Regions:
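Class I SAM-dependent methyltransferase SAM-binding "motif I" and its flanking Rossmann-like core
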Residues: 181-225
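Active-site histidine-anchored catalytic micro-motif
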Residues: 68, 83-84, 92-115, 166-169, ...
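Glycine-rich anion-binding loop/nest that anchors nucleotide
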Residues: 171-173, 216-250
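Glycine-rich beta-strand-to-loop/alpha-helix junction loops that act as flexible
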Residues: 73-78, 172-176, 239
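N-terminal glycine-/serine-/threonine-rich phosphate-binding loop
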Residues: 2-70
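Ligand-binding beta-strand-loop-alpha-helix segment within the catalytic cores
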Residues: 19-35, 95-169
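Glycine-rich N-terminal segment of FAD-binding domains in flavoprotein oxidoreductases
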Residues: 64-92
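Conserved small/polar residues in nucleotide/adenosyl-binding loops
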Residues: 256-259
Length: 259
């Protein structure tokens, strides 16, 4: 929305009509310059709980139809509140994940998936270890595979996603340089799962996990832009003022991709 707001909005400072339009006309005025639909919430918890409910509804609908629900999920801080609410719904409301397929969006390379600072380990500790998902329904890029097998490995990862009917919901954060998963700004729209070299900004950000820059892997196996946008629903999460400028670029500005 064409309004300079934080994800922590103080109601005495900003009128709700600027982020919670009352009718279709007000919404059309506020969103007329948006390239993608955008919702603003008063708090992280409110926004995260809404997305968790949307995910839970899709899981239950798929259960009733006797079908898998395929989720593409990241690690990182942005989705942590969503995962917390999903765990609560599992424990307190009986939400089952037995019909859920999870694909990890990316993994550092070279790095074992079992490493304490792997993205997969973060995803397990934040969500997967606390729900009743079948372990055979969890898939992650393997950061320990041989270099000469990466191309074929990535092709098979895409093939496995398609074998389950594609992704139902992709959950994303956005990096400080505007990356989704590890697709940097300007990545090809038709890119699929592949090995990429991390730029300096991404490595510096990742070094917080690995302790030092020297210990930080130089590359990552990541789902591509086409893989992510092929999902039936995509939720991009951004909390706090430090993401405001990046979200403005995503929502209001023209699209640019590399050749």
């Amino acid at each position: 929305m064409k309004t300079n707001l934080s994800s922590q909005i103080s109601l005495h400072r900003v009128s709700p009509r600027y982020y919670r339009p009352e009718n279709a006309f007000e919404k059309s005025v506020l969103t007329r310059l948006e390239k993608i639909p955008t919702d603003i919430y008063e708090s992280v918890e409110e926004g995260a709980n809404y997305i968790a409910r949307e995910i839970a509804q899709t899981i239950r609908e798929k259960q009733k139809a006797g079908r898998f629900c395929v989720l593409a999920l990241p690690g990182g801080d942005s989705p942590s509140h969503v995962y917390t609410e999903l765990i609560r719904m599992h424990k307190e409301e009986g939400l089952s994940f037995r019909n859920v397929i999870v694909f990890n969006m990316y993994e550092y390379y070279p790095l074992s998936p079992d490493a304490i600072n792997s993205n997969f380990n973060a995803l397990k500790s934040m969500l997967l270890d606390h729900i009743d998902i079948d372990k055979q329904n969890i898939f992650t890029p393997d950061g320990s595979i041989a270099k000469d097998t990466i191309f074929e490995y990535c092709r098979l990862y895409e093939q496995r996603i398609e074998s389950f009917g594609g992704i139902d919901i992709a959950l994303l954060g956005i990096g400080r340089v505007g990356n989704i998963a590890f697709n940097e700004p300007g990545s090809r729209l038709n890119s699929t799962t592949r090995l990429i070299l991390l730029d300096n900004a991404s490595r510096n950000e990742a070094s917080k996990i690995f302790g030092t820059l020297d210990n930080t892997p130089i590359s990552s196996i990541t789902m591509g832009v086409a893989t992510i946008l092929g999902a039936k629903k995509v939720y991009l999460l951004a909390w706090g003022e430090n993401k405001a400028a990046m979200i403005k670029e995503c929502v209001d500005c023209l699209l640019y991709t590399s050749d």
